[in-house]
Protein backbone atom coordinates (compact mmCIF):
# COMPACT_ATOMS: atom_id res chain seq x y z
CA UNK A 1 0.00 0.00 0.00
CA UNK A 2 1.20 3.50 -0.85
CA UNK A 3 -0.54 6.73 -0.08
CA UNK A 4 -0.96 7.38 -3.81
CA UNK A 5 -2.97 4.18 -4.15
CA UNK A 6 -5.53 5.13 -1.50
CA UNK A 7 -8.96 5.74 -3.05
CA UNK A 8 -9.32 9.16 -1.41
CA UNK A 9 -5.86 10.34 -2.40
CA UNK A 10 -6.86 11.14 -5.98
CA UNK A 11 -9.97 12.90 -4.69
CA UNK A 12 -7.76 14.94 -2.38
CA UNK A 13 -5.50 15.84 -5.31
CA UNK A 14 -8.51 17.02 -7.32
CA UNK A 15 -9.68 19.04 -4.34
CA UNK A 16 -6.20 20.56 -3.91
CA UNK A 17 -6.16 21.63 -7.56
CA UNK A 18 -9.50 23.33 -6.98
CA UNK A 19 -8.64 25.36 -3.86
CA UNK A 20 -4.86 25.78 -3.95
CA UNK A 21 -5.08 29.38 -5.18
CA UNK A 22 -7.87 30.41 -2.82
CA UNK A 23 -6.93 33.06 -0.26
CA UNK A 24 -7.93 32.68 3.37
CA UNK A 25 -8.57 36.42 3.45
CA UNK A 26 -11.60 35.82 1.28
CA UNK A 27 -12.83 32.93 3.40
CA UNK A 28 -12.75 35.17 6.48
CA UNK A 29 -14.46 38.11 4.78
CA UNK A 30 -17.68 38.90 6.70
CA UNK A 31 -19.85 38.29 3.66
CA UNK A 32 -18.34 34.81 3.26
CA UNK A 33 -18.20 33.86 6.94
CA UNK A 34 -21.73 33.59 8.36
CA UNK A 35 -22.56 31.95 11.67
CA UNK A 36 -21.31 29.52 12.68
CA UNK A 37 -18.14 31.33 11.73
CA UNK A 38 -15.08 29.73 10.24
CA UNK A 39 -13.38 30.06 13.64
CA UNK A 40 -16.23 28.11 15.22
CA UNK A 41 -16.32 25.45 12.53
CA UNK A 42 -12.61 24.73 12.79
CA UNK A 43 -12.30 24.81 16.59
CA UNK A 44 -11.58 21.45 18.22
CA UNK A 45 -10.65 20.28 21.70
CA UNK A 46 -9.32 17.17 23.37
CA UNK A 47 -7.13 16.05 26.22
CA UNK A 48 -7.54 19.40 27.94
CA UNK A 49 -6.19 21.34 24.94
CA UNK A 50 -7.95 23.49 22.36
CA UNK A 51 -6.98 23.94 18.73
CA UNK A 52 -7.90 26.62 16.20
CA UNK A 53 -7.39 25.19 12.70
CA UNK A 54 -9.31 28.00 10.97
CA UNK A 55 -6.23 29.83 9.67
CA UNK A 56 -5.21 26.84 7.57
CA UNK A 57 -5.75 26.54 3.83
CA UNK A 58 -8.51 24.03 4.31
CA UNK A 59 -12.26 23.75 3.96
CA UNK A 60 -14.72 21.31 5.48
CA UNK A 61 -14.26 19.23 2.35
CA UNK A 62 -10.48 19.20 2.91
CA UNK A 63 -10.87 17.81 6.41
CA UNK A 64 -13.40 15.26 5.22
CA UNK A 65 -11.01 13.95 2.56
CA UNK A 66 -8.00 14.02 4.90
CA UNK A 67 -9.90 11.95 7.45
CA UNK A 68 -10.91 9.50 4.71
CA UNK A 69 -7.25 9.10 3.77
CA UNK A 70 -6.35 8.45 7.42
CA UNK A 71 -9.07 5.84 7.68
CA UNK A 72 -8.11 4.11 4.41
CA UNK A 73 -4.43 4.12 5.41
CA UNK A 74 -5.28 2.18 8.57
CA UNK A 75 -4.62 4.81 11.22
CA UNK A 76 -7.27 3.35 13.50
CA UNK A 77 -5.93 -0.17 13.07
CA UNK A 78 -2.34 0.82 13.77
CA UNK A 79 -3.37 2.99 16.72
CA UNK A 80 -5.28 0.11 18.28
CA UNK A 81 -2.40 -2.29 17.63
CA UNK A 82 -0.02 0.07 19.44
CA UNK A 83 -2.25 0.34 22.50
CA UNK A 84 -2.74 -3.45 22.55
CA UNK A 85 1.00 -4.13 22.63
CA UNK A 86 1.19 -5.70 19.17
CA UNK A 87 4.38 -5.48 17.14
CA UNK A 88 4.22 -2.10 15.40
CA UNK A 89 8.00 -1.71 15.09
CA UNK A 90 8.57 -4.60 12.66
CA UNK A 91 12.21 -3.89 11.78
CA UNK A 92 13.18 -4.44 15.42
CA UNK A 93 10.35 -6.84 16.24
CA UNK A 94 9.10 -4.70 19.11
CA UNK A 95 5.92 -3.43 20.62
CA UNK A 96 5.65 0.32 21.12
CA UNK A 97 4.20 0.94 24.56
CA UNK A 98 5.07 4.38 25.83
CA UNK A 99 1.32 4.72 26.41
CA UNK A 100 1.53 1.86 28.93
CA UNK A 101 3.84 4.03 31.05
CA UNK A 102 0.95 6.37 31.83
CA UNK A 103 -1.95 3.91 31.68
CA UNK A 104 -4.35 3.73 34.62
CA UNK A 105 -6.08 0.50 33.59
CA UNK A 106 -4.64 -2.52 35.45
CA UNK A 107 -5.29 -4.52 32.28
CA UNK A 108 -2.81 -2.41 30.32
CA UNK A 109 0.34 -4.22 29.13
CA UNK A 110 3.10 -4.45 31.77
CA UNK A 111 0.97 -2.51 34.26
CA UNK A 112 2.38 -4.15 37.42
CA UNK A 113 5.95 -3.81 36.18
CA UNK A 114 5.49 -0.14 35.35
CA UNK A 115 3.86 0.64 38.70
CA UNK A 116 6.60 -1.12 40.66
CA UNK A 117 9.36 0.82 38.92
CA UNK A 118 7.54 4.11 39.38
CA UNK A 119 7.11 3.40 43.09
CA UNK A 120 10.85 2.77 43.34
CA UNK A 121 11.47 6.07 41.55
CA UNK A 122 9.12 7.91 43.90
CA UNK A 123 10.77 6.56 47.05
CA UNK A 124 14.19 7.58 45.75
CA UNK A 125 13.01 10.99 44.53
CA UNK A 126 11.45 11.77 47.90
CA UNK A 127 14.67 10.80 49.67
CA UNK A 128 16.69 13.15 47.47
CA UNK A 129 14.17 15.99 47.68
CA UNK A 130 13.81 15.80 51.46
CA UNK A 131 17.55 15.72 52.09
CA UNK A 132 17.41 12.21 53.52
CA UNK A 133 19.70 10.98 50.74
CA UNK A 134 23.14 12.36 51.52
CA UNK A 135 26.49 12.47 49.80
CA UNK A 136 29.74 10.98 50.99
CA UNK A 137 30.43 13.83 53.44
CA UNK A 138 26.91 13.81 54.88
CA UNK A 139 25.65 16.83 52.94
CA UNK A 140 22.28 16.78 51.24
CA UNK A 141 22.00 16.68 47.45
CA UNK A 142 21.68 20.12 45.90
CA UNK A 143 22.69 19.36 42.31
CA UNK A 144 21.39 16.70 39.94
CA UNK A 145 23.33 16.04 36.74
CA UNK A 146 21.48 14.04 34.08
CA UNK A 147 23.92 12.48 31.62
CA UNK A 148 22.30 11.12 28.48
CA UNK A 149 21.78 11.97 24.83
CA UNK A 150 18.88 11.98 22.40
CA UNK A 151 15.75 10.73 24.13
CA UNK A 152 17.69 10.34 27.37
CA UNK A 153 18.29 14.09 27.40
CA UNK A 154 15.88 16.06 25.21
CA UNK A 155 12.65 14.97 26.89
CA UNK A 156 13.72 15.31 30.53
CA UNK A 157 15.50 18.60 29.83
CA UNK A 158 12.48 20.04 28.06
CA UNK A 159 10.09 19.06 30.86
CA UNK A 160 12.32 20.20 33.74
CA UNK A 161 12.75 23.61 32.12
CA UNK A 162 9.07 23.89 31.20
CA UNK A 163 7.96 23.12 34.75
CA UNK A 164 10.68 25.08 36.53
CA UNK A 165 7.99 26.98 38.44
CA UNK A 166 6.93 23.68 40.05
CA UNK A 167 10.44 22.52 40.90
CA UNK A 168 11.96 22.45 44.38
CA UNK A 169 14.31 25.41 44.94
CA UNK A 170 16.58 23.14 46.97
CA UNK A 171 17.92 21.32 43.90
CA UNK A 172 19.40 22.59 40.63
CA UNK A 173 19.19 20.20 37.69
CA UNK A 174 21.83 20.17 34.95
CA UNK A 175 21.85 18.23 31.69
CA UNK A 176 24.95 16.98 29.89
CA UNK A 177 24.68 15.33 26.48
CA UNK A 178 27.43 16.37 24.09
CA UNK A 179 30.67 14.41 23.90
CA UNK A 180 32.34 17.80 23.52
CA UNK A 181 34.10 18.08 26.87
CA UNK A 182 33.01 21.71 27.16
CA UNK A 183 29.47 20.55 27.93
CA UNK A 184 30.49 18.54 30.98
CA UNK A 185 33.26 20.91 32.05
CA UNK A 186 30.84 23.84 32.14
CA UNK A 187 28.58 21.92 34.52
CA UNK A 188 31.53 20.84 36.66
CA UNK A 189 32.25 24.51 37.34
CA UNK A 190 28.76 24.93 38.81
CA UNK A 191 28.48 21.91 41.11
CA UNK A 192 30.02 20.59 44.31
CA UNK A 193 30.76 16.85 44.20
CA UNK A 194 29.82 16.52 47.87
CA UNK A 195 26.29 17.67 47.00
CA UNK A 196 25.83 16.19 43.52
CA UNK A 197 23.83 13.23 42.26
CA UNK A 198 24.60 11.96 38.76
CA UNK A 199 21.91 10.11 36.80
CA UNK A 200 23.45 8.15 33.93
CA UNK A 201 20.78 7.36 31.34
CA UNK A 202 21.42 4.99 28.46
CA UNK A 203 19.25 2.21 27.12
CA UNK A 204 22.27 0.02 26.36
CA UNK A 205 24.71 1.69 28.74
CA UNK A 206 27.23 1.62 25.90
CA UNK A 207 26.31 4.91 24.19
CA UNK A 208 29.59 6.64 23.28
CA UNK A 209 28.70 10.16 24.35
CA UNK A 210 26.96 9.17 27.56
CA UNK A 211 29.58 6.73 28.77
CA UNK A 212 32.44 9.10 27.91
CA UNK A 213 30.83 11.81 30.03
CA UNK A 214 29.93 9.34 32.80
CA UNK A 215 33.51 8.10 33.09
CA UNK A 216 34.90 11.63 33.12
CA UNK A 217 32.46 12.69 35.83
CA UNK A 218 33.27 9.59 37.89
CA UNK A 219 36.99 10.34 37.60
CA UNK A 220 36.33 13.94 38.64
CA UNK A 221 34.48 12.80 41.76
CA UNK A 222 37.43 10.65 42.76
CA UNK A 223 39.92 13.44 42.02
CA UNK A 224 37.89 15.74 44.27
CA UNK A 225 38.13 13.32 47.17
CA UNK A 226 35.15 11.00 46.89
CA UNK A 227 36.24 7.45 47.80
CA UNK A 228 35.36 4.87 45.16
CA UNK A 229 33.48 2.99 47.86
CA UNK A 230 31.21 6.02 48.32
CA UNK A 231 30.33 6.57 44.65
CA UNK A 232 27.06 4.71 45.24
CA UNK A 233 25.87 7.80 47.11
CA UNK A 234 26.35 9.91 43.99
CA UNK A 235 25.69 7.74 40.91
CA UNK A 236 22.52 6.03 39.75
CA UNK A 237 21.81 4.44 36.39
CA UNK A 238 18.77 4.14 34.13
CA UNK A 239 19.01 1.43 31.50
CA UNK A 240 17.49 -1.60 29.83
CA UNK A 241 20.82 -3.33 30.44
CA UNK A 242 21.24 -3.51 34.25
CA UNK A 243 24.24 -5.83 34.02
CA UNK A 244 26.20 -3.19 32.12
CA UNK A 245 25.24 -0.55 34.70
CA UNK A 246 26.63 -2.68 37.51
CA UNK A 247 29.72 -3.40 35.43
CA UNK A 248 30.28 0.36 35.19
CA UNK A 249 30.41 0.48 38.97
CA UNK A 250 26.94 1.63 39.96
CA UNK A 251 25.41 -0.27 42.86
CA UNK A 252 22.69 -2.74 41.86
CA UNK A 253 20.16 -1.08 44.15
CA UNK A 254 20.81 2.22 42.32
CA UNK A 255 19.72 0.85 38.94
CA UNK A 256 16.37 1.95 37.51
CA UNK A 257 14.96 -0.05 34.65
CA UNK A 258 13.63 0.98 31.27
CA UNK A 259 12.44 -1.49 28.65
CA UNK A 260 13.02 -2.26 24.99
CA UNK A 261 9.34 -1.69 24.24
CA UNK A 262 9.84 2.01 24.94
CA UNK A 263 11.70 4.00 22.31
CA UNK A 264 14.19 6.57 23.51
CA UNK A 265 12.31 9.56 22.14
CA UNK A 266 9.16 8.33 23.88
CA UNK A 267 10.81 7.47 27.19
CA UNK A 268 10.52 10.52 29.45
CA UNK A 269 7.48 8.87 31.09
CA UNK A 270 9.69 6.03 32.36
CA UNK A 271 12.67 6.00 34.72
CA UNK A 272 14.37 8.13 32.06
CA UNK A 273 12.31 10.89 33.66
CA UNK A 274 13.91 10.39 37.08
CA UNK A 275 15.45 13.86 36.90
CA UNK A 276 11.95 15.23 36.24
CA UNK A 277 10.52 13.44 39.26
CA UNK A 278 13.30 14.70 41.52
CA UNK A 279 12.77 18.25 40.28
CA UNK A 280 8.96 18.49 40.50
CA UNK A 281 8.16 15.61 42.87
CA UNK A 282 6.25 12.35 42.43
CA UNK A 283 2.80 13.95 42.65
CA UNK A 284 3.51 16.40 39.84
CA UNK A 285 5.14 13.62 37.82
CA UNK A 286 1.88 11.71 38.18
CA UNK A 287 0.07 14.79 36.87
CA UNK A 288 2.38 14.80 33.84
CA UNK A 289 1.44 11.18 33.20
CA UNK A 290 -2.25 11.92 33.77
CA UNK A 291 -2.24 14.63 31.12
CA UNK A 292 -0.60 12.31 28.62
CA UNK A 293 -3.08 9.57 29.49
CA UNK A 294 -5.96 11.97 28.94
CA UNK A 295 -4.66 12.65 25.43
CA UNK A 296 -4.15 8.91 24.92
CA UNK A 297 -7.82 8.34 25.69
CA UNK A 298 -8.85 11.14 23.35
CA UNK A 299 -6.69 9.70 20.55
CA UNK A 300 -8.07 6.23 21.13
CA UNK A 301 -11.74 7.11 21.59
CA UNK A 302 -12.57 10.30 19.69
CA UNK A 303 -13.89 9.95 16.14
CA UNK A 304 -11.23 10.76 13.57
CA UNK A 305 -13.22 13.81 12.48
CA UNK A 306 -12.74 15.37 15.94
CA UNK A 307 -9.45 13.76 16.92
CA UNK A 308 -6.71 16.31 17.61
CA UNK A 309 -3.68 14.11 16.79
CA UNK A 310 -5.37 12.92 13.60
CA UNK A 311 -6.32 16.42 12.47
CA UNK A 312 -2.91 17.87 13.34
CA UNK A 313 -1.12 15.04 11.57
CA UNK A 314 -3.30 15.05 8.46
CA UNK A 315 -3.10 18.83 8.05
CA UNK A 316 0.68 18.39 8.20
CA UNK A 317 0.44 15.83 5.38
CA UNK A 318 -1.74 18.27 3.42
CA UNK A 319 1.08 20.81 3.38
CA UNK A 320 3.94 18.33 2.99
CA UNK A 321 2.50 16.19 0.20
CA UNK A 322 0.30 18.64 -1.66
CA UNK A 323 1.69 22.13 -1.13
CA UNK A 324 5.27 20.82 -1.06
CA UNK A 325 6.25 22.52 2.20
CA UNK A 326 9.67 21.29 3.28
CA UNK A 327 9.58 22.46 6.88
CA UNK A 328 7.19 23.50 9.58
CA UNK A 329 7.68 25.81 12.53
CA UNK A 330 6.78 25.29 16.18
CA UNK A 331 6.44 28.65 17.92
CA UNK A 332 5.55 28.36 21.61
CA UNK A 333 4.71 31.76 23.03
CA UNK A 334 6.17 30.65 26.33
CA UNK A 335 9.80 31.00 27.34
CA UNK A 336 9.32 27.99 29.60
CA UNK A 337 8.79 25.89 26.45
CA UNK A 338 12.13 26.99 25.02
CA UNK A 339 13.29 23.39 24.55
CA UNK A 340 10.04 22.10 23.05
CA UNK A 341 11.08 22.69 19.40
CA UNK A 342 14.34 20.76 19.83
CA UNK A 343 12.45 17.95 21.56
CA UNK A 344 9.97 17.81 18.68
CA UNK A 345 12.82 17.81 16.17
CA UNK A 346 13.89 14.41 17.41
CA UNK A 347 10.36 13.16 17.91
CA UNK A 348 9.27 13.98 14.36
CA UNK A 349 12.41 13.74 12.24
CA UNK A 350 13.92 10.65 13.86
CA UNK A 351 10.52 8.97 13.73
CA UNK A 352 9.36 9.84 10.24
CA UNK A 353 12.52 10.88 8.41
CA UNK A 354 12.48 7.62 6.46
CA UNK A 355 12.65 6.58 2.79
CA UNK A 356 11.91 2.86 3.14
CA UNK A 357 8.30 1.75 3.28
CA UNK A 358 7.15 -1.03 5.58
CA UNK A 359 7.26 -3.44 2.63
CA UNK A 360 10.90 -2.54 1.94
CA UNK A 361 10.26 -0.52 -1.21
CA UNK A 362 11.41 3.09 -1.41
CA UNK A 363 8.90 5.90 -1.09
CA UNK A 364 8.27 8.15 -4.08
CA UNK A 365 6.75 10.94 -1.98
CA UNK A 366 8.02 13.26 0.78
CA UNK A 367 7.92 12.10 4.38
CA UNK A 368 8.90 14.09 7.50
CA UNK A 369 9.24 17.83 7.12
CA UNK A 370 12.10 19.66 8.81
CA UNK A 371 10.91 20.67 12.28
CA UNK A 372 12.29 23.86 13.77
CA UNK A 373 11.30 26.68 16.05
CA UNK A 374 11.97 29.23 18.75
CA UNK A 375 9.80 30.79 21.43
CA UNK A 376 7.83 33.92 20.70
CA UNK A 377 8.45 36.76 20.70
CA UNK A 378 12.14 36.03 20.07
CA UNK A 379 11.47 34.40 16.72
CA UNK A 380 9.65 37.49 15.47
CA UNK A 381 12.93 39.39 15.60
CA UNK A 382 14.92 36.61 13.94
CA UNK A 383 13.15 34.73 11.14
CA UNK A 384 9.54 35.91 10.92
CA UNK A 385 10.61 38.21 8.09
CA UNK A 386 10.97 35.10 5.92
CA UNK A 387 7.66 33.68 7.12
CA UNK A 388 5.79 36.83 6.14
CA UNK A 389 7.50 37.88 2.91
CA UNK A 390 9.67 35.00 1.74
CA UNK A 391 8.64 32.89 -1.26
CA UNK A 392 8.55 29.69 0.82
CA UNK A 393 5.39 28.69 2.66
CA UNK A 394 6.15 27.40 6.15
CA UNK A 395 3.16 26.09 8.14
CA UNK A 396 3.29 27.13 11.79
CA UNK A 397 2.03 25.70 15.05
CA UNK A 398 1.56 28.54 17.52
CA UNK A 399 1.26 27.43 21.15
CA UNK A 400 -0.29 29.98 23.48
CA UNK A 401 -0.46 29.61 27.27
CA UNK A 402 -3.39 31.73 28.40
CA UNK A 403 -2.32 32.38 32.00
CA UNK A 404 1.25 33.01 33.17
CA UNK A 405 3.16 30.79 35.57
CA UNK A 406 5.11 33.78 36.96
CA UNK A 407 4.20 36.93 38.92
CA UNK A 408 4.99 39.43 36.12
CA UNK A 409 1.41 39.27 34.91
CA UNK A 410 1.51 42.64 33.13
CA UNK A 411 3.77 41.09 30.49
CA UNK A 412 1.29 38.43 29.51
CA UNK A 413 -1.24 40.44 27.47
CA UNK A 414 1.67 41.69 25.37
CA UNK A 415 2.87 38.14 24.80
CA UNK A 416 -0.55 36.83 23.81
CA UNK A 417 -1.25 39.87 21.64
CA UNK A 418 1.89 39.17 19.65
CA UNK A 419 0.96 35.52 19.17
CA UNK A 420 -2.55 36.22 17.95
CA UNK A 421 -1.48 39.21 15.85
CA UNK A 422 1.15 37.15 14.07
CA UNK A 423 -1.41 34.52 13.12
CA UNK A 424 -3.72 37.26 11.83
CA UNK A 425 -0.99 39.04 9.86
CA UNK A 426 0.24 35.81 8.31
CA UNK A 427 -3.28 35.00 7.19
CA UNK A 428 -4.58 38.35 5.96
CA UNK A 429 -1.37 39.89 4.62
CA UNK A 430 -1.26 43.30 2.94
CA UNK A 431 -2.21 43.92 -0.68
CA UNK A 432 -0.32 46.19 -3.07
CA UNK A 433 -3.08 48.78 -2.90
CA UNK A 434 -2.88 48.78 0.89
CA UNK A 435 0.90 48.98 0.68
CA UNK A 436 0.70 52.06 -1.57
CA UNK A 437 -1.33 53.85 1.08
CA UNK A 438 1.21 52.95 3.76
CA UNK A 439 4.12 54.05 1.56
CA UNK A 440 2.49 57.38 0.78
CA UNK A 441 2.28 59.32 -2.45
CA UNK A 442 5.84 60.58 -2.11
CA UNK A 443 7.40 57.08 -1.96
CA UNK A 444 5.54 54.83 -4.40
CA UNK A 445 8.70 52.81 -5.02
CA UNK A 446 8.49 51.55 -1.43
CA UNK A 447 5.09 49.92 -1.90
CA UNK A 448 6.26 46.53 -3.30
CA UNK A 449 8.48 46.10 -0.26
CA UNK A 450 5.50 46.62 2.03
CA UNK A 451 3.38 43.90 0.45
CA UNK A 452 2.62 40.84 2.58
CA UNK A 453 1.22 37.95 0.52
CA UNK A 454 -0.68 36.51 3.47
CA UNK A 455 -2.37 33.15 3.07
CA UNK A 456 0.35 31.67 5.29
CA UNK A 457 -1.12 28.73 7.23
CA UNK A 458 -1.06 28.53 11.01
CA UNK A 459 -2.59 26.39 13.72
CA UNK A 460 -2.99 27.84 17.20
CA UNK A 461 -2.97 25.47 20.16
CA UNK A 462 -4.35 26.93 23.38
CA UNK A 463 -3.26 25.83 26.84
CA UNK A 464 -5.14 27.31 29.80
CA UNK A 465 -2.07 27.18 32.05
CA UNK A 466 1.33 25.53 31.88
CA UNK A 467 0.86 22.71 34.36
CA UNK A 468 2.34 19.24 34.51
CA UNK A 469 -0.98 17.87 33.25
CA UNK A 470 -1.31 20.24 30.30
CA UNK A 471 2.31 19.67 29.31
CA UNK A 472 1.78 15.91 29.38
CA UNK A 473 -1.20 16.28 27.07
CA UNK A 474 0.72 18.54 24.70
CA UNK A 475 3.62 16.10 24.41
CA UNK A 476 1.29 13.15 23.85
CA UNK A 477 -0.54 15.12 21.15
CA UNK A 478 2.65 15.34 19.11
CA UNK A 479 3.60 11.72 19.86
CA UNK A 480 0.34 10.52 18.36
CA UNK A 481 0.62 12.93 15.44
CA UNK A 482 3.81 11.05 14.53
CA UNK A 483 1.98 7.72 14.40
CA UNK A 484 -0.77 9.19 12.23
CA UNK A 485 1.66 10.56 9.68
CA UNK A 486 3.90 7.49 9.69
CA UNK A 487 0.90 5.28 9.03
CA UNK A 488 -0.21 7.33 6.03
CA UNK A 489 3.35 7.38 4.68
CA UNK A 490 3.53 3.60 5.26
CA UNK A 491 6.83 3.82 7.14
CA UNK A 492 8.08 2.59 10.51
CA UNK A 493 7.97 5.55 12.88
CA UNK A 494 9.65 3.65 15.70
CA UNK A 495 13.12 2.66 14.51
CA UNK A 496 16.12 4.89 13.79
CA UNK A 497 18.59 3.04 11.58
CA UNK A 498 19.75 6.37 10.19
CA UNK A 499 21.94 6.98 13.24
CA UNK A 500 23.91 3.73 12.87
CA UNK A 501 26.28 4.26 9.93
CA UNK A 502 27.78 7.42 11.35
CA UNK A 503 28.39 5.65 14.67
CA UNK A 504 30.22 2.79 12.95
CA UNK A 505 32.43 5.06 10.86
CA UNK A 506 32.94 7.34 13.85
CA UNK A 507 34.76 4.58 15.71
CA UNK A 508 37.04 4.02 12.72
CA UNK A 509 37.81 7.72 12.35
CA UNK A 510 38.41 8.11 16.09
CA UNK A 511 41.01 5.36 15.96
CA UNK A 512 42.60 6.97 12.90
CA UNK A 513 43.02 10.28 14.71
CA UNK A 514 45.52 8.79 17.16
CA UNK A 515 46.84 5.67 15.37
CA UNK A 516 50.38 5.41 13.97
CA UNK A 517 50.50 6.76 10.42
CA UNK A 518 50.90 3.30 8.95
CA UNK A 519 47.66 2.12 10.59
CA UNK A 520 45.39 4.93 9.38
CA UNK A 521 42.58 3.47 7.27
CA UNK A 522 41.86 4.55 3.72
CA UNK A 523 38.98 6.97 3.28
CA UNK A 524 37.77 9.23 0.52
CA UNK A 525 40.07 12.16 -0.23
CA UNK A 526 37.95 14.67 1.71
CA UNK A 527 37.73 12.59 4.90
CA UNK A 528 41.42 11.67 4.66
CA UNK A 529 42.37 15.35 4.42
CA UNK A 530 40.22 16.22 7.42
CA UNK A 531 41.78 13.41 9.46
CA UNK A 532 45.29 14.52 8.50
CA UNK A 533 44.54 18.11 9.51
CA UNK A 534 43.12 16.99 12.86
CA UNK A 535 46.03 14.60 13.52
CA UNK A 536 48.46 17.46 13.07
CA UNK A 537 46.48 19.70 15.42
CA UNK A 538 46.14 17.02 18.09
CA UNK A 539 49.91 16.51 18.18
CA UNK A 540 50.54 20.13 19.13
UniProtKB/Swiss-Prot annotation:
Pathway: Carbohydrate biosynthesis; gluconeogenesis; Carbohydrate degradation; glycolysis; D-glyceraldehyde 3-phosphate and glycerone phosphate from D-glucose: step 2/4. Belongs to the GPI family. GO terms for biological process: gluconeogenesis; glucose 6-phosphate metabolic process; glycolytic process. It is found in: Cytoplasm. It comes from Paraburkholderia phytofirmans (strain DSM 17436 / LMG 22146 / PsJN) (Burkholderia phytofirmans). It catalyses: alpha-D-glucose 6-phosphate = beta-D-fructose 6-phosphate. The keyword S-adenosyl-L-methionine does not apply. It is an enzyme of class 5 (isomerase). The active site is at 350 (proton donor), 381, 503. This is Glucose-6-phosphate isomerase. One of its GO terms (cellular component) is cytosol. The gene is pgi. Keywords: Cytoplasm, Gluconeogenesis, Glycolysis, Isomerase. One of its GO terms (molecular function) is glucose-6-phosphate isomerase activity.
Amino acid sequence: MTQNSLPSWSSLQTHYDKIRDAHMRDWFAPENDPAPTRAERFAFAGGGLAADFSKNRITEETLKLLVQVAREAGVEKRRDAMFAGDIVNPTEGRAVLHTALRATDPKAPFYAQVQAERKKMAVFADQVRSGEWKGYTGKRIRYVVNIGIGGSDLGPKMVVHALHHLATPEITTHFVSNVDGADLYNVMQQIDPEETLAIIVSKTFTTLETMTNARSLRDWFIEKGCPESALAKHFVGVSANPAEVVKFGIAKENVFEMWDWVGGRYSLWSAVGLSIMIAIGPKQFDELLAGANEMDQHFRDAPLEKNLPVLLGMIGIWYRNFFGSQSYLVAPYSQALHFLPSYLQQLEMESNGKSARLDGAMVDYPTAAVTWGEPGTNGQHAFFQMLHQGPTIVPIDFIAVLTPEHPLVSHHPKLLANCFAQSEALMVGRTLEEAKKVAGADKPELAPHLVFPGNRPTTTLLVDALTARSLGALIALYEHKVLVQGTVWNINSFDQWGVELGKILGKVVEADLTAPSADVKKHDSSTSALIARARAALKK
